Amino acid sequence: FVCHLPSRRGGALVSARYRSYCCTRLREQVDSLMAQGGEGTHCLLLGDFNGDPEEAPTIEALRSRPYTADMAVQDLPPESLLALLHRETRQEPPGSYCYQGVWSQLDQAHLTASLLQQQGHLHYVVGSAETVCRPFFTTQLIGGGAPVPWRTYGGNFYRGGYSDHFPIRLLLEYE
């Protein structure tokens, strides 16, 4: 699933219910596909969730939990959703989006536990999920600090940048 959930415009708390609704529908689709597909079925959700992985729409409505390397994934139901980019995994940059100097991981990657349990030929390469920050994606804010995404637009002005979000990526292997 490639996702772009509703914006935080108007306030994160006010708009959270719209993101929760979308996450509930996504969870229903994941459950349906996993129930129909049997062993070797996997789901991957990527995109702009317009919230951090630790926020209510992700934790409660999507029922995704942070994946850590010490997690006993073999004991999880295959349809369990796991967030790959969260507070415990963040390095540099500290998120995929920076607004008024505050970083957030709005761009997220979630996968079913089946992709970690080596069911079938396809699996996630553990530790490969990352927020991609290359020099040509960035600009320096006045006053210094860490480089931030080089926006395409600033208000109504075209700036010519790549995006206001850094991209994310992960590796899957097929054996």
Give the label of every model feature segment.
Residues 1-7:
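Active-site-proximal beta-strand elements of phosphoester/diester hydrolases
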Residues 2, 45-46:
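Generic enzyme active-site microenvironment
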Residues 5, 48-49:
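Active-site metal-binding loops of divalent metal-dependent hydrolases
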Residues 7-12, 53:
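Short, well-ordered, mixed-charge alpha-helical segments that flank or form enzyme active sites
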Residues 13-39:
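A long, amphipathic alpha-helix that forms part
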Residues 32-44, 50-175:
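Metal-dependent phosphoester-hydrolase catalytic domains
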